Amino acid sequence: MGKLTILVLVAAVLLSTQVMVQGDADQPADRDAVPRDDNPGGTSGKLMNVLIRSGCPWHPWCG
């Protein structure tokens, strides 16, 4: 009976260390992450940035 108890304790320790090393694979920060908007103005904002940088020939568009 003593050997069985030791065997169960060793198995429990090995399983707990495996869980600690591997993690639980459920990362709520990664799963619920919202993609960063690199272009907050959208396509029109990107177009305006290009036009302003290139010396926009259409003054009503360039503001």
UniProtKB/Swiss-Prot annotation:
Tissue localization of expression is:
Expressed by the venom duct.
Signal peptide position in this chain? 1-23
- Family listed: Belongs to the O2 superfamily. Contryphan family.
The name of this protein is Contryphan-Eb
Alphabetized, the UniProt keywords read: Amidation, D-amino acid, Disulfide bond, Hydroxylation, Ion channel impairing toxin, Neurotoxin, Secreted, Signal, Toxin
Modification D-tryptophan occurs at:
W58
Per UniProt, the ranges with Basic and acidic residues bias are 28-39
